Every structure is written in C-alpha cells, then in structure tokens.
Swiss-Prot record:
Principal subcellular localisation of the protein: nucleus
Subunit structure: Homodimer.
Gene3D superfamilies (UniProt xref): Helix-loop-helix DNA-binding domain
One GO CC term, this protein: nucleus
Organism in which the protein naturally occurs: Arabidopsis thaliana
Name of protein: Transcription factor bHLH3
Gene Ontology biological process terms, A to Z: negative regulation of gene expression; regulation of DNA-templated transcription
This protein's record includes keyword Ribosomal protein: no
Length: 467
C-alpha cells in the first residue's frame, strides 16, 4: 500500500485544494475508522449490459453523467457499503488534449495520490494520456474512491438506498445537501440537478449541469433499466451478471470509464474512452498505469494475523471514541453545508474562508438593517410633516404687523410638552414666545388642577422631551 496523502502536509494541502476539505476529512476518517481499503471491496467487471444501460440513460438526454453505486456486504462488521460499480460520463463539446494547463497536471497528481492511498502500488505510475481535465471529469473520476456506509451515512447514495425512495434535487442548495462530502467537486463542476434512484442491488445516480424539472417518467425509466434481477446481485458472495466475484485472486477487474460527446455533436467528433482498472493487477486510472500487486486481494480470512493477547476493554473504548469523533465531525460538516448554501459570494471553499465570509455577510446585513431603519424613521417624519402644512396669517396694522402661524399639534415642536401637561391635568392658560440671541424661549403660564407637584411635573416634562 502506498503512502497516504494525509501523511504529507504538502500532498494533503494539494488534495484538499482540489477536492475540498470535506472530502479530504471524509477520506481520512473513513480510513481511520474502518481501515478498509478499496482493494478489499468488490470491483465489478466491465460488463456491457450495465455499461450500455448507463450510456442509454445519459446519451440523448440532458444528464451529464450516470453512476451505479453497488451495495456490497464485504465485511459484516462494516455492514452494507455502497461502492463504485460502473459509470458513464459525456465529454463537453470542444474538450481536447490540446487545452492542457498546470491545473490539469495538479488534478492528475491528486488522482494519483488518491489511487496510491486507497489502492496502493509499489511501482511508479506513468502518464499515458495527456490533455485537459474538466471539473466534470474530476468529479466523475474522484467518485471512484468514495464509499458510503449505509448504517452511518444518511445522505447521498446511502440515504437513498436505506430509505428506498428516489431523490430529485433541482436547485443548488439541495444538490449540495445530497453530495455533502463531494459538494466542493459538485460546485466546481456546476451541477444544477441530481437524481438518485434505488434499485435492486444499489443506487443509480444521475447529474446534470442544467436545471431539469422533476419528471416521474425518468425515474420509472431508470427503474425499468436497472431494476431487473439480471443486473447486479450484491450478497455476501456477490455475483455480477451471473459471474462469481472473488475478493481474492490476481485477475485484473477492469472498469470502463467512457467519455462521449452529446448525441447532437457526434458528427465529426470522437474521443477515445478511458479504461480504468479500479482494483487489481495492471491498475490504470485515467491514464495512470501501475504494476501488479497481488496482495490487494487478500480477504480478512487470508490476511496473516498477529499473535498476541485479546484486546482489552480500553480498545473498545478507543473505538467508541473514534466513532463519536466521526459523528461529531459529520454534524459539524452538516452545519457548514447549510451555512454554505445561504452565504453568497464565497471566496474560497475551505471552512476558515467560509466562516470569514459568513461573518462579513452578517456584518454587512446588520449595517444595512441599521441604514434601513434610519431611512424608515426619516421617511415617517417627512410624511408626518407633509400631512398638513402650516398656515400663515399676516395682518398689517398702522405701526406694525402681526404674523400668526398655526399647525397641527402633533407636528409642533412643543407637542410633547402639551401632551404631558394634558396627561397630568395641567392646562396652560397663557403662553409666550420670546427670541433671544441663543434661541427661542417658550413660556407657559399654568394653572394646576391635579395632585402633581412642581418637581414631579418637571421630571415628566424632561422625560417626554428626551424621547
């Protein structure tokens, strides 16, 4: 088994930047919890019936890929596990080997690190096919290394398989909620619709870069194509298309990963398919080729066991602690998925950047709320002032003139004073306005009628003016 990518900080950073922190944590926690490599899981042979069924669903439609997740009970302690069974993905129009960039080289290196970490090889991989790798290709090829335990993962293919109900997500938040640990890859590819349909021995997953409204006829078509007993039967000793699959042995089991253009673009455009030897000798993943490694097929019964004492209770407590930590991480990741769905303009996909973007977004929203509240109060004041304009009466006399201003009480500056006086049964019988150098002095002559003292009335007037 090759070196795990998370054992080297540079490799881990490279992988995390390409597939996302959630997927990186998922791979690490999966390897730590079960210690089950992909080489132990059942890898179905490249059967034409299954491949033709997947191709039939994708070609001539708006779906961009189709995956078959095979339900396999490899280890009774792990329960049912959904692993890659087969797949088909179309190539975008115009994708060619000439459009090659440094990012494509990084993607290939990440795929190689994943292959070495979960399949393993002591020999060098050599690149036999160059060219551009789109984000759709990267999502499709990286999915080869994912597996989903049905007893712990209640989302994605495992959630569909356990519930037995199809799932159709036709918006970005719902798609990200389904993909979860693959959400970084899905967002990069730009998926708008995902369909997950449970069948007899697994789950068929379809994804599209377009928005596709829910159509029950599509679900029925998938069930009719993949729901028959002539397809995969996954049991303790799985058989695929009537062929006995052995978890041991040295025969290579090839998986065809085909990329084909859309039907309407077939004329004058062809691209060779990629053979993926997922598990076994002469492994080749998207142009990477490795030597034979017969030890990958050892089952639990064939592996040499170390002699020694039985594990103490402390070992079980440690395993329980690992499981609790895994569940805690999963719940935390769920919160991040929900946060990512509601925060716009995410700068980066890592958790630290997501939290920083969320804080910035919330702060901006609080500022906008304060501005809106202030504008609302100003508008109310303007509306109240525009209800009834003040009336001006001008009278000319022999030696002088009299100017009389009248306006509604609620719009007058001393309206609060008058209202407070009325509430305390104090009626002003005379008032006078005097102009000084510093302002205006409004004098009221009062005639107390209630039991309110002068000091109490003063406090109430000050309180009303301070509001």
């Amino acid at each position: 088994m090759g070196q795990k990518f998370w054992e080297n900080q540079e490799d881990r950073a490279m992988v995390e930047s390409t597939i996302g922190s959630e997927a990186c944590d998922f791979f690490i926690s999966t390897a730590s919890a079960s210690n089950t490599a992909l080489s132990k899981l059942v890898s179905p042979p490249s059967d034409s019936n299954l491949q033709q069924g997947l191709r039939h669903v994708v070609e001539g439609s708006d779906w961009d890929y189709a995956l078959f997740w095979l339900a396999s009970n490899v280890n009774s302690s792990d329960g049912c596990v959904l692993i890659w069974g087969d797949g088909h993905c179309r190539v975008k129009k115009g994708a060619s080997g000439e459009d090659y960039s440094q990012q494509d080289e990084i993607k290939r290196r990440v795929l190689r690190k994943l292959h070495l970490s979960f399949v393993g090889s002591d020999e060098d991989h050599r690149l036999v096919k160059s060219g551009a790798l789109t984000d759709l290709d990267m999502f499709y090829l990286a999915s080869l290394y994912f597996s989903f335990r049905c007893d712990t993962n209640k989302y994605g293919p495992a959630g569909t398989y356990v519930s037995g109900k199809p799932l159709w997500a036709a918006d970005l938040p719902s798609c990200l909620s389904y993909y979860r640990v693959r959400s970084f890859l899905a967002r990069s590819a730009g998926f708008q619709t995902v369909l997950s349909v449970p069948v007899n021995s697994g789950v068929v997953e379809l994804g599209s870069l377009r928005h596709i409204p829910e159509d029950k006829s599509v679900i029925e078509m998938v069930k009719s194509v993949f729901g028959g007993s002539d397809f995969v039967q996954a049991k303790e000793a799985p058989k695929i298309f009537g062929r006995q699959l052995s978890l041991g042995g040295a025969k290579p089991r090839s998986m065809s990963i085909n990329f084909s253009p859309k039907t309407e673009d077939d004329t004058g455009f062809s691209l060779e398919s990629y053979e993926v030897q997922a598990i076994g000798g002469s492994n080749q993943v998207y142009g990477y080729e490795q030597g034979k490694d017969e030890t990958l097929y050892l089952t639990d019964e064939q592996k040499p066991r170390k002699r020694g004492r039985k594990p103490a209770n402390g070992r079980e407590e440690a395993l329980n602690h690992v499981e609790a930590e895994r569940q805690r991480r999963e719940k935390l990741n769920q919160r991040f998925y929900a946060l990512r769905a509601v925060v716009p303009n995410i700068s980066k996909m890592d958790k630290a950047s997501l939290l920083a973007d969320a804080i910035t977004y919330i702060t901006d929203m609080q500022k906008k709320i304060r501005v809106y509240e202030t504008e609302k109060q100003i508008m109310k004041r303007r509306e109240s002032n525009q209800i009834t304009p003040a009336e001006v009466d001008y009278q000319q006399r022999h030696d002088d003139a009299v100017v009389r201003l009248s306006c509604p009480l609620e719009t007058h500056p001393v309206s609060k004073v008058i209202q407070t006086l009325r509430e305390n049964e104090v009626m002003p019988h005379d008032s006078n306005v005097a102009i000084t150098e510093e302002g205006v002095v409004h004098t009221f002559t009062l005639r107390p009628q209630g039991g309110c003292t002068a000091e109490q009335l003063k406090d109430k007037l000050l309180a009303s003016l301070s509001q």
